[in-house]
Amino acid sequence: MIHAGQSSSLTPAASPPHRRGKHKIFIGMAPGVGKTYRMLEEGQQLKQEGFDVVIGLLETHGREETAQKAIGLEQVPLRTMIWQGRSLLEMDTGAILARSPQLALVDELAHTNIPGAEREKRYQDVELILAAGIDVYSTINIQHLESLNDLVYKISGVVVRERVPDRLLDEADEVVVVDVTPETLQERLQEGKIYAQDKINQALQNFFKRQNLVALRELALREVANNIEENSRHDQQTNHCAVHERILVCISTYPNSIQLLRRGGRIASQMNGRLFVLFVAPTNQFLSKVEALHVETCQHLTQEFEGEFIRQESDNVVGAIAQVATTYRITQIVLGESRRSRWHLLIKGSIIQRLMRCLPTVDLHIIANG
């Protein structure tokens, strides 16, 4: 359950070793709002109170104030890895587990590990640490949430490649929004507190435009507020609650399938419903390597959203969708706009029109392409 801005959720050392650690996430609208500084500040306070606190991974990005705030906190040595002939540093999850502190501070939750590491993403390392009974404080920016990827692109024009599943926010014991005004953040940028001098003008003209920051700030505040409301609503429900929404996303080999899947994932999350994703493959027709990889990506993304991926072979797309909708008791279907020609639509009708006739009690969400 998420509690924005509550006191420390740290668990005393006397707790049984088999318990899961507690996770507190510091989230903000953009780099430079002060997430890492706030995390270190709370870590220092807990150390003074007698808790065993270590830094598992810290990214100061050359910010002197942040580095100063880490002084006095034990830092677990990083692990050196060789990749493409270069020596690079990564968080040493094994060393953190062996050290077994009460609390580990881990920066940049969305980071992608070096190829060859035991786990692909840093958040997976954090989940391992939590499973060992160690509490974790971590940081992330709102644009790294998987389901918001398309929306962030529309706001900023930036494609965010490092992403985490939304469930991390849902499963966190506490989420704290580290908030500053867009004007304050732009001032920090101009003072060289976020990026090097040679990158400041470019940042101000792109991601750090005032209108972008206003929209991202609203997005961060609204997302956490929605999570609090959803968790509160979930706590009030009993095991004998009414019928849950069951959302079916229909994907194809077109690139917009990723957008459809994210939209369906958000609908399922907001309605506390179950997510199903259907791919109907034509019979006696092989997918190209690119198409097969695309479908595999959709399947992986479905797992990130904790949904169920369904693959069927059929030349009757409408019939296959209707059958799955009936079998899985689907209440809502998410589809993309039809790409067929006007002549085809005039002769056979659109998939949407035919589905409306087949499934009159199911709500259809038609998502525009682009």
Swiss-Prot record:
GO terms for cellular component: membrane. Residues 1-22 are annotated as: Disordered. Keywords: Kinase, Transferase, Two-component regulatory system. Its EC number is 2.7.3.-. It comes from the Bacteria. Residues 1-12 have a biased composition (Polar residues). In the C-terminal section; belongs to the universal stress protein A family. Member of the two-component regulatory system KdpD/KdpE involved in the regulation of the kdp operon. KdpD may function as a membrane-associated protein kinase that phosphorylates KdpE in response to environmental signals. This is Putative sensor protein KdpD.
